[in-house]
A protein has these predicted regions:
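Short, charged/polar connector segments at secondary-structure boundaries
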Residues: 1-83, 94, 100
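Amphipathic, charge-rich alpha-helical segments that serve as recognition/docking helices
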Residues: 24-26, 67-147, 153
Length: 154
């Protein structure tokens, strides 16, 4: 996959696609079931967005499509578009791409902001700039997650 260029779409075996960023999204069983029906009827309409990590391609956008493909025996490959991104940018892309249609839940936004600050070491100001948001938005998302108990946040 070393010759895969940014923006290029390739067919990738479903079994090779990782979900390390799945933890930033809440499960939605109804939406996933609807996606299974759609993929069974129409096939894959839009490519996944993936970034490359040492383990292989990791989904940034298309978690429901990947989940649907895993339940459909006839679907063994998915089309994926490569996005070149470091860790903070990958998280920002998840927020940006998933905020287009059905808006992400505040808890999902908080998980990403928390990861950018606590795991990636960015300041709140840097996170605000990266995400194109106001510092107060970042502060509110951090406060939301940090006020929840550890048990509720997982």
């Amino acid at each position: 996959m070393d010759d895969w260029t940014e923006g290029e779409i390739r067919a990738i075996a479903v079994a090779m696609i990782g979900e390390r960023y799945r933890r930033y999204r809440l499960p939605d069983a109804a939406a996933e079931a609807a996606m299974v029906g759609s993929m069974a009827r129409y096939g894959q309409i839009a490519p996944l967005a993936v970034c490359l990590r040492q383990e292989g391609p990791e989904v940034l956008d298309g978690f429901k499509r990947l989940a649907a493909a895993k339940t459909l025996p006839a679907v063994t490959v998915l089309q994926a578009r490569l996005v070149v991104a470091d860790e903070p940018t990958a998280k920002a892309i998840i927020l940006g791409l998933n905020g287009i249609g059905a808006r992400m839940k505040e808890l999902e936004e908080a998980w990403i902001v928390h990861a950018l600050v606590r795991e990636d070491g960015l300041s709140q100001h840097q996170v605000a700039e990266l995400l194109g948001r106001h510092k107060s938005w970042v502060c509110r998302r951090l406060a939301l997650l940090e006020r929840l108990s550890e048990e509720c946040a997982r």
